[in-house]
Regions:
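Exported/periplasmic ABC-transporter solute-binding proteins
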Residues: 1-184
Length: 184
């Protein structure tokens, strides 16, 4: 019943603060995520190693999320900030996917040369290898905030759970599945 006690949102546009639902001073970022480029596991004959490779002869097809899903929005933002979005689109190299799992499936099956996904998804996929992280500053940070709800039926338990989320045990688990944990 933690969800009746705390609020955790991946989408920063969902601002429960304005709805006056969270206890003041309890909001914090649990973890952050990265955007990475992946290739089929054990198969990278063209030596793809950089996001910029997408507009070179190294890449025939790249899987990206549709523009209506977060991973697609981050991919577009990255390529726009690299000054390569228009060029990439004009080269007809993009295989669009409806979600990050579909991007992973296309890459793992070898249907595309590479794809753009979250590090957490890459870390839990057996079918891909990470070859690059998105260049620093090429997209807005991906953070997952949490806060204790004002109407928590058991605020002490909620506080204990939040303390657990901030602790070293949780940090190990989060790191193992590809999340970055904010430093204190």
């Amino acid at each position: 019943k933690q969800m009746d006690q705390i609020d955790i949102k991946a989408d920063p546009k969902v601002n429960t603060k304005k709805l006056d639902l969270v206890l003041e001073g309890t909001r914090f970022n649990i973890v952050s995520n990265k955007v990475v480029m992946v290739v089929p596991k054990g198969h990278n004959p063209k030596g793809i190693s950089d996001f910029r490779d997408a507009v070179t002869e190294k890449v025939f097809l790249i899987a990206l999320g549709n523009s209506d899903v977060p991973v697609g929005q981050y991919s577009e933002e990255i390529y726009k900030n690299l000054g390569l979005w228009d060029k990439l689109k004009s080269m007809n190299k993009i295989s669009y996917a409806s979600n990050v799992k579909e991007v992973l499936s296309q890459v793992a099956a070898g249907a595309v040369d590479c794809g753009i996904v979250y590090s957490t998804d890459a870390a839990t996929s057996k079918g891909v290898d990470v070859v690059a992280e998105a260049p620093k500053g090429s997209h807005k940070p991906i953070t997952y905030p949490a806060a204790i709800l004002k109407k928590a039926k058991n605020p002490e338990a909620a506080t204990s759970f939040v303390d657990f989320l901030k602790g070293p045990e949780s940090s190990k688990i989060f790191n193992k599945i590809g999340f970055a944990v904010p430093t204190k």
